[in-house]
């Protein structure tokens, strides 16, 4: 009987801690949406670089010149890379 009670109380404590941690993560993710930290900005920069270079490689077939992809938010495609203008 004592073992069952201890197991139930332990599970309840773990569940409470897990719920609290999940709420904290959700709050942090909402804060990140408002102001992006440097690591998230770096990921966005890498995405822009990848999108631009892939776009240029796909468009550059035969002797056709690569049409520069218009990168948004102050970025420009140069030499198959998005660079900050």
UniProtKB/Swiss-Prot annotation:
UniProt keyword Nucleotide-binding, yes or no: no
Source organism superkingdom: Eukaryota
One example GO MF annotation: toxin activity
InterPro entries: Hwtx-2-like (IPR012625)
Major localisation: secreted
Disulfide-bond pairs as recorded: 52-66, 56-77, 71-82
Subcellular location: Secreted
Keywords annotated in UniProt: Disulfide bond, Neurotoxin, Postsynaptic neurotoxin, Secreted, Signal, Toxin
Tissue: Expressed by the venom gland.
Keyword field contains Membrane: no
Coiled coil spans: none
Signal peptide location: 1-22
UniProt record similarity statement: Belongs to the neurotoxin 12 (Hwtx-2) family. 02 (Hwtx-2) subfamily.
Protein name: U4-theraphotoxin-Hhn1w
Species name: Cyriopagopus hainanus (Chinese bird spider)
């Amino acid at each position: 009987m004592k073992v069952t009670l201890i197991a139930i109380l332990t599970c309840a404590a773990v569940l409470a801690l897990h719920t609290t941690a999940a709420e904290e993560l959700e709050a942090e993710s909402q804060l990140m949406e408002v102001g992006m930290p440097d690591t998230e900005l770096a990921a966005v920069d890498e995405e822009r670089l990848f999108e631009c270079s892939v776009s240029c490689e796909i468009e550059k077939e035969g002797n056709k010149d690569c049409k520069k992809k218009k990168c948004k938010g102050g970025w420009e495609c140069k030499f198959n890379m998005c660079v900050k203008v």
